[in-house]
Amino acid sequence: MAVKQRIDQQSAWVLHTLPWRETSLIVEVFSRDHGRLALVAKGARRPHSAFRGVLMAFQPLLMDWSGGGEVRTLVRAEWQGGQPLLTGQALLCGYYLNELLVKLTPRDDPHPNLFVAYADAVRELGLGRPPPPVLRQFELALLQELGYGIELVHDVQSGEAVRGDATYAYIIEGGPAALDAPGDAPPDLPVVSGQTLLDMAAGDFSRSETLAQSKRLLRVLINHYLGGQPLQSRRVLQELLEL
């Protein structure tokens, strides 16, 4: 039997909402200390509900909820403010971040560092920062925080440190392996420079080559861990932007 509990004053972000019954919502949230979970907001669609206008994506909230099981009951939600609204390209990028969290994070699995990375990404998008480096930073943080062991600084075959002047094939669920020439890599493995790997490890996406190569590498890795699940937000982004 699920243990019922009351959680108060929990920092959280709304990832997705769905209508439920006639007047309520199922709200998928990402919380600081409890990870991703589903809450039912009873009566949230009624005209005078305290939840109306509060349960918005990309806005920091404080939430109280109660209950056990797969879906808890949302008791209170309070807007914290301070976050610019996402519009245009930034809004599409935000939906992409949310879809990654929904499809890759298990429920009830806390990831406080990932929570901080998400908040940082949303803030940067809201401030009008160029989206590509913001997305790459978050994608990398997501894979690392979920325990996928993204190796960036050691050659997995030789054990030696990655060299900035070398070229590597990236073995999925392994790591970089040095190549004598870029054409030596198997066709299904991404090829990256050592400098790109070192830049990624340092969180530096300022070089154009690093930005381009990290995009390809992270896309391959994310697709692998998605296990064939499509990302609708990515499809829209690909149609509108080169992200």
Curated annotation (Swiss-Prot):
Q: Does the keyword DNA damage apply?
A: yes
Organism's domain of life? Bacteria
User: Which Pfam families does this chain map to?
Assistant: RecO_C (PF02565), RecO_N (PF11967)
Taken from the UniProt entry, a GO cellular component term is: bacterial nucleoid
Is Lyase one of the keywords UniProt gives this record? no
Keyword list (alphabetical) reads:
DNA damage, DNA recombination, DNA repair
Give an example GO biological process.
DNA recombination
> Which InterPro entries does the record cross-reference, listed alphabetically?
ARFGAP/RecO, DNA_rep/recomb_RecO_N, NA-bd_OB-fold, RecO, RecO_C
The entry sums up its family as follows: Belongs to the RecO family.
Functionally, this protein is described as follows: Involved in DNA repair and RecF pathway recombination.
Q: What is this protein called?
A: DNA repair protein RecO
Which source organism does the UniProt entry give? Azoarcus sp. (strain BH72)
Name of the encoding gene: recO
